[in-house]
UniProtKB/Swiss-Prot annotation:
Gene it is expressed from: MB
Subcellular location(s) per record: Cytoplasm, Sarcoplasm
Enzyme Commission number(s): 1.7.-.-, 1.11.1.-
Protein name from the UniProt record: Myoglobin
Modification sites for Phosphothreonine: 68
Major place of residence: cytoplasm
Its job: Monomeric heme protein which primary function is to store oxygen and facilitate its diffusion within muscle tissues. Reversibly binds oxygen through a pentacoordinated heme iron and enables its timely and efficient release as needed during periods of heightened demand. Depending on the oxidative conditions of tissues and cells, and in addition to its ability to bind oxygen, it also has a nitrite reductase activity whereby it regulates the production of bioactive nitric oxide.
GO molecular function: heme binding; metal ion binding; nitrite reductase activity; oxygen binding; oxygen carrier activity; peroxidase activity
Length: 154
């Protein structure tokens, strides 16, 4: 299920665009996640009280968390699938502390692709979208495998 060198290059090329504004992209990803899948908001004590998009946009905590999420994801993507060391602590915290189901990782993956498409459509054609989808699926599958090792049925 791995990606070819050419696919990784497509992923990293568009990720460079994301990195030009990690806070803005991260905020947009979380807002899209919470609006599209309101049940995910319940996993975030710091954000549960945010009911409207305007409230979400005004939240510095939400923007900071979006930055954290996309910074971590960028570090994982740059490993081109060799991300064991990065995945382990992430799976540990998301399984044992946050109890984030794999389904929610699918939801945020969708949000990431939608945000990149809306902000960088000229640099995110079908090939790049397909490569990013594969990279995010690889990430999710590896997280799911770690969840299983940890006994989390997420």
């Amino acid at each position: 299920m791995g990606l070819s060198d050419a696919e990784w290059q497509l992923v990293l090329n568009v990720w460079g665009k994301v990195e030009a504004d990690i806070p803005g992209h991260g905020q947009d990803v979380l807002i899209r996640l919470f609006k599209g899948h309101p049940e995910t908001l319940e996993k975030f004590d710091r954000f549960k009280h945010l009911k409207t998009e305007d409230e979400m946009k005004a939240s510095e905590d939400l923007k900071k968390h979006g930055t954290t999420v996309l910074t971590a994801l960028g570090g994982i993507l740059k490993k081109k699938g060799q991300h064991e060391a990065e995945i382990q602590p992430l799976a540990q915290s998301h399984a044992t502390k946050h109890k984030i189901p794999v389904k929610y990782l699918e939801f945020i993956s969708e949000a990431i692709i939608q945000v990149i498409q809306s902000k960088h459509s000229g640099d995110f054609g079908a090939d790049a979208q397909g490569a990013m989808s594969k990279a995010l699926e690889l990430f999710r599958n590896d997280i799911a495998a770690k969840y299983k090792e940890l006994g989390f049925q997420g």
